[in-house]
Design a protein with these regions (language model features):
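Feature 926 captures the class I aminoacyl-tRNA synthetase adenylation module centered on the KMSKS loop
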Residues: 196, 431-493, 497, 554-634, ...
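N-terminal catalytic cores of NTP/NDP-binding nucleotidyl/phosphoryl-transfer enzymes
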Residues: 27-88, 141, 210-213, 217, ...
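Generic start-of-chain signal for non-secretory N-termini
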Residues: 1-28, 971
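Short conserved beta-strand and strand-loop elements enriched in small hydrophobics
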Residues: 197-199, 239-245
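Residue patterns forming the tRNA-binding/recognition surfaces of aminoacyl-tRNA synthetases
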Residues: 4, 13, 17-21, 89-207, ...
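Active-site-adjacent "gating/activation" loops or surface patches in catalytic cores
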Residues: 247-253, 487-529, 732-739
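Extended active-site and interfacial segments that coordinate phosphate-rich ligands
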Residues: 51-59, 208-242, 267-274, 284-292, ...
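Short, solvent-exposed turn/loop segments enriched in Gly/Ser/Thr/Pro and often Arg
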Residues: 30-39, 74-85, 138-146, 168-175, ...
């Protein structure tokens, strides 16, 4: 072994060897164990959340492989419709082109080209994390095999009456020109206004006041709602109001949705542009009035004609034109064609001129913003495709979506067939499914799975694998030519099929990739369904987890996975959400490889366009990382993630903690070197009677206990606990204690004890390497290669070794009790040395008093080891009643362990030093107490700063107590 641990050289070497050897592929032996990688966007790069989640999955896969399971970690990437299309459109924009300049086929071809050039970035970064995934089976959601599964699911659901096309309210991105899912919408707090507007009754005798943050949508109002029990407005229900600035009249309706105690108790109802209003409109049969075109401009402008592009057929375009004309007739001409925000300004001014603007006041808004374009999302009535998830029975008597799709997915969790970890997330899952809406699955994009539907000239729909299949399965003959729907499917539609489509469904035989390599075979690979556990974030329980359960249950009759482990979200050391604009994001590869300050600043500010934000981020980075980020290596990063992986919703990543686990790796490396340096040449056989010494039997007992704990923690997904157990055993018991306890035997004259100790050192080290391997695979493999020949092991890699089972190790409780007593005595001596500032190298006298017969027997047995390891003279007993010298003492049970102080320290100097230190700490405590006693500080400082100050007081008081006790001992 090299003298020092150098992660970079080791990591690249071993990953390439593992992958080339086929070590990541299913063995074909043992019970199946499968984990599905949540497919990252093909556009993406590895972030801290990915690295954390993939470390958890990799630990599980490596652990189960060592336990003899037939493991498959199924990986792949998602085509990420909107994100990928946006990247290529941005490239075209730099060339002063649009996708329409290229045309659909040429644009899609260009996206494929970009994918081939850049799509492997994130998978190569996953390799850097050590992901032991079967890359030979890597899939892409636009692969032909997966595309075939998508088409079959769409066609089967459509023919079962479970997919329909309808005019519904959706999240509309007016910049991208497509519907988007809730997950692609961020609610951003912004400063805005609340406008209070007076609506007069039609007879002009009375009025009501309505408050709104979007006065422009008033043009689409169809009613004003009040609570049924609100006596103030009971007499107005059923009467009509004049809609300001228009010649329309709208009714006053009563609905329980209204909170009569909020504001004026009157709510304007705009069903075409608000989700809650849409539901109210449905209940009261109010026809929505759409006032916007698809560019979020008031209807009546020159770009309205472009909106016909989203109509699927000439007949539908005609219908849309009639609907737009009807809406347009209700909009005053002066607002037509205006951008929504221009219209807002003009409408507010006109309301003020008309004397109908009662009040304007500042208001904090939660604005829905598109994740991809930064445009403000507009609720919009458009024609889209939907999966029915809410009806019990269809008109023709067939089961509706709730019965056929939703309820089986609910039952899978309620019955315990699928379990969530932590368990409370099952409530989130069931609550969402209990209140589910039909799923909008169409997107107005070019990149994605094109919807397999065609329209004739009369607007009739034909669905099939292709046009010929659609015609063959048509109930009626098409009128004229057929034209395929221009829309593509929601990315989540193909992702919902991931558990079984990646295994080869629905193909009858082997599925091959573009290189002709077999990547799946349903008949063989369905043994991996259900997978063992899904590791994912809580933010996609609705969008992905539930939909996988729905689709998998419907098409295979099986659940997709047995357990769902919901991992935490990674935040910075202060608990703040990581974001580029805050300057607190970390690139996992920068932690692994290290990065100097200037490249780090340049990298972190590269995409920040606002000068003030860029300056703020640069200042923070220079403060937080004055010397850049040191390289800690993959293993230390993985250990950090494992140690943080609790059941909490968030984890705080502190680079200092990661540096601590780099020190752990160094400690393990040096311990292995110590063991190997104390071995003779050749294989080390187990001597007869081994283990001979109590120290050996103690370390083996503790190893057994630790392995048992680790196995339980793997089962319960308490990665933080298993990391702690492995850390404490390796650092404290193996390195700090057993290596020390072994020295007397290794250096003594008892050849049998020396041989036995050498063998036990090897056995324990090799077992620890196996136990640590799922967490820190690179360093353990490198060390194991030097250890294996000494034990006569013939495997090529640590990955081929079995998990070290606790039940294979014998425990010796008696030996453990003896060594624990011995450790306590040594710890007492060392604590006194530390407290009294006595050099560890200085030999000191050791006195013992009190105790019982067992203590005397143990002292006699361990006298030489105590003197050797504690650097003391031979222990001397002070008999009862004898005078005792001034001494510092530690207590072990009833035994007193004493170090006489005479001649060891300058009592006067030590008293002075202690007095100064006590005074200094008292001052620090007063400072902290002063801050916390300041009400303004407590009220205005960040919560984490207040917590830190309180913790400082606790820590200072602990230290102060210890120092005062030392001073008392000195008299």
């Amino acid at each position: 072994m090299e003298k020092s641990f150098e992660p970079a050289q080791i990591e690249s070497k071993w990953y390439e060897r593992w992958e080339a050897s086929g070590a990541f592929q299913p063995s074909g032996k043992g019970a199946p164990y499968c984990i599905l990688l949540p497919p990252p966007n093909v556009t993406g790069t590895l972030h801290m959340g990915h690295a954390f989640q993939q470390t958890v999955m990799d630990m599980l896969v490596r652990y189960q492989r060592m336990r003899g399971m037939n493991t498959l970690w199924q990986v792949g990437t998602d085509h990420a419709g909107i994100a990928t299309q946006k990247i290529v459109e941005n490239q075209l924009a730099a060339e002063d082109k649009t996708r329409h300049d290229l045309g659909r086929d040429a644009f899609v071809e260009r996206v494929w080209k970009w994918k081939e050039e850049s799509g492997s970035t994130i998978t190569n970064q996953m390799r850097r994390i050590g992901a032991a995934a079967d890359w030979s089976r890597e899939r892409f959601t636009m692969d032909e095999g997966l595309s075939a599964a998508v088409r079959k699911v769409f066609i089967d659901w459509y023919r079962a009456g479970l997919i329909y096309r309808g005019n519904r309210l959706v999240n509309w991105d007016p910049v991208l020109g497509t519907a988007v899912s809730d997950l692609e919408v961020n609610n951003v707090e912004r400063d805005g206004h609340m406008w209070s507007i007076r609506y007069m009754t039609s007879d002009g005798a009375e009025s009501v006041v309505v408050a709104t943050t979007r006065p422009e949508t008033m043009l689409g109002d169809v009613a004003v709602a009040v609570h049924p029990e609100d006596e103030r407005y009971a007499h107005l229900v059923g009467r009509t109001l004049k809609l300001p600035l228009t010649d329309r009249e709208i009714p006053v309706i009563a609905d329980d949705y209204v909170d009569k105690d909020f504001g004026t108790g009157c709510v304007k109802i705009t069903p075409a542009h608000d989700f809650n209003d849409y539901a109210i409109g449905q209940r009261h049969s109010l026809k929505p009035i759409n006032i916007f075109n698809l560019h979020a401009r008031i209807l009546g402008g020159p770009d309205d004609a472009k909106d016909g592009a989203v109509a699927a057929s000439p007949m539908e375009a005609l219908d849309k034109g009639i609907e737009a004309a009807n809406s347009l007739n209700k909009i005053p001409e002066r607002y037509r064609g205006l951008d929504r925000y221009e219209a807002r300004k003009l409408i507010v001014a006109d309301l003020e001129d008309a004397g109908l603007l009662v009040e304007t006041k500042p208001h904090k808004l939660q604005v829905p913003v598109s994740q991809r374009s930064d445009a403000v999302i507009e609720p919009m009535l458009t024609d889209q495709w939907f999966v029915d998830l809410t009806s019990d029975v269809q008109k023709d008597g067939r089961p509706g979506g709730r019965k056929a799709i939703t309820e089986p997915a609910l039952d899978a969790v309620r019955s315990g067939e699928i379990k969530f970890v932590p368990e409370n997330w099952s409530t989130t899952y069931t609550q969402w499914l209990d209140n589910i809406q039909d799923w909008c699955i169409s997107r107005q994009l070019w990149w994605g799975h094109r919807i397999p539907a065609w329209y004739d000239e009369a607007g009739n729909i034909f669905v099939g694998e292709n046009e010929a299949d659609a015609r063959a399965n048509a109930g009626t003959a098409p009128v004229g030519a057929l034209r395929q729907d221009d829309d593509v499917l929601d990315t989540w539609f193909s992702s919902a099929l991931w558990p079984f489509s990646t295994l080869g469904w629905p193909a009858d035989g082997p599925v091959k990739n573009e290189r002709g390599e077999v990547v799946a075979n349903w008949e063989q690979d369905k043994i991996f369904l259900p997978s063992a556990v899904l590791v994912t974030g809580f933010d996609i329980i609705f969008f992905w987890v539930a939909r996988m359960v729905m689709a998998t249950k419907y098409f295979t009759g099986r659940i997709p996975f047995r357990e769902v482990y919901i991992n935490a979200i990674v935040r910075d050391a202060e608990g703040q959400k990581m974001s580029k604009s805050k300057g607190n994001t970390l690139d996992p590869l920068d932690l692994i490889d290290g990065i100097a300050l200037e490249p780090l600043v340049a990298k972190s500010t590269k995409s920040l366009l606002i000068p003030q934000v860029r300056a703020k981020v640069e200042k923070r980075i220079r403060k937080d990382y004055p010397d850049g980020i040191p390289a800690i290596g993959t293993d230390a990063l993985r250990f950090t993630f494992a140690a943080l992986a609790s059941y909490s919703r968030t984890i705080n990543f502190d680079i200092k903690r990661a540096e601590g686990y780099k020190a752990f790796c160094n400690k393990l490396w040096n311990a292995a070197r110590f063991v190997l340096m104390n071995l003779p040449e050749g294989e080390i056989a187990a001597p007869v009677g081994a283990p001979v010494t109590e120290a050996e039997r103690w370390i083996l007992t503790r190893l057994k206990q630790t392995l048992g704990d680790v196995e339980q923690h793997f089962t319960s997904y308490r990665f933080d606990h298993l990391a702690q157990a492995l850390y404490e055993f390796t650092w404290n018991e193996l390195c700090d204690w057993f290596l020390e306890l072994a020295k007397p035997a290794l250096n003594g004259e008892d050849g049998v004890a020396a041989a036995s100790t050498r063998h036990t050192l090897l056995v324990v080290l090799e077992s620890v390497l196996r136990a640590l391997h799922p967490v820190i695979p690179f360093i353990t493999e490198e060390i194991w290669q030097s250890v294996a020949p000494k034990l006569g092991l013939t495997e090529d890699s640590l990955m081929q070794r079995p998990w070290p089972r606790a039940e294979d190790i014998l425990a010796d409780d008696a030996a453990t009790a003896e060594i624990e007593w011995f450790k306590n005595v040594l710890s007492g001596v060392r604590k006194i040395r530390s407290e009294m500032n006595i050099s560890p190298a200085k030999a000191i006298p050791l006195l013992l008093a009190d105790g019982d017969a067992n203590d005397r027997a143990r002292v006699a047995k361990f006298a030489a080891q105590i003197a050797f390891l504690a650097r003391t003279d031979s222990p001397q007993w002070v008999e009862a009643g004898a005078d005792e010298p001034a001494a510092a003492a530690a207590v072990v049970g009833t035994l007193r362990v004493m170090i006489p102080l005479a001649g060891l320290i300058d009592l006067g100097a030590e008293k002075t030093r202690l007095a100064k230190e006590i005074t200094r700490i008292e001052v620090e405590i007063k400072k902290c107490e002063g801050k916390l006693g300041n009400a303004n500080f407590v009220a205005n400082a960040p919560a984490e700063v207040v917590v830190q100050e309180r913790q400082r007081i606790t820590d200072w008081n602990t230290t102060l107590t210890a120092l005062r006790e030392q001073a008392r001992k000195l008299g």
